[in-house]
Amino acid sequence: MRFKAKEHKEIGDLESAYSFAQTHALTEKNLLTAHRLLATTLLPRAALGKYRDQMVYVYSSAGMEYAALEPEHLASAMRQLFGGIRDLRRSSIDLSEAFYHAALIHLVFVHIHPFMDGNGRAARLLEKWFLASKLGRQVWHVPSEMFYKEHVAEYYRNIKLGLNFYTLDYERCVPFLRMLVRSLLSRVEEPEV
């Protein structure tokens, strides 16, 4: 597979963000720094590592798919999310609970949609970062990002739980939560060559 120069830069930006995450604690401030690294090619410098100050809508070829949380509510929603993450990091949870909460953090973050761009990349990084904080460094090798890319239509279908932040139906989130575990199983079940 050949990559264009911009794609090479985006990959390098992601590698920088993941390297940063592997050597820093999972905090809201550090997530903003990681976003600054991963979105360098995506956004103007003034928007890097900063919550958006305008409404965003997610569109597909079929039209508007999702209206994100209003910008005036982002700081509060992110404080609440990171308060929950902090509590989970301090608590004793088992392996299955760690995967459940990591996937749920990913999903909630995507629904908050705090940045002008790079939200999916930041959500996948946040998911992995949380898992590593609970289970150790070996989690950085879990191929979840590749699995999500290989199943991108399913990924977007499973994220879609409502038309806007206020109509999200988390009772329908189980198919999305299962994708993280399936990313592990897909590699275990691959035939050896």
Describe the residue ranges of each PLM region:
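FIC/Doc superfamily catalytic core
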Residues: M1-V193
